[in-house]
């Protein structure tokens, strides 16, 4: 935990004794680390680990004072490759911090859309929709993306079930 956190002593002592949550156990089971901090100097230089299920390299970031309610992650898609298709029961905002590529989003009704993005793009993945990201850059390390869950959705949603959104 950061030494300059402005929290009450009571809250700080709770953080010291806080047990693992299903969410933190899931991150560990995925083979990834959670980097606790208030500030990351350069998202392009944080150490990443292979994320086998997704097919890229990643690390989760956690704002110290909010615990896991404001997690986000940095992910790198290998050059000329794609991440495995997947869906999630949380909202996700994506800020592209390097490279270029495309994303395909689809729902169970068959509606499908593909769009391109590049460095500086910001877009959202609709709740519970399938999606797949593609790196259109041919250089190693060309694409690093910061994915942030809107309003801390991912850790908090847990097992809530949501209706499929229309694209």
Which residues does each PLM region occupy?
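A short hydrophobic beta-strand segment most commonly corresponding to one strand
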Residues: 93-95, 123-124, 138-158
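A short, N-terminal "cap"/entry segment at the start of jelly-roll beta-barrel domains
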Residues: 1-69, 161-166
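Short histidine-centered beta-strand/loop micro-motifs
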Residues: 60-64, 83-88, 105, 114-115, ...
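His/acidic/aromatic-lined binding-pocket segments of jelly-roll/cupin-type domains
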Residues: 74-75, 85-87, 91-96, 114-115, ...
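Glycine- and acidic-residue-biased ligand/ion/polar-headgroup-sensing regions
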Residues: 78-79, 89-108
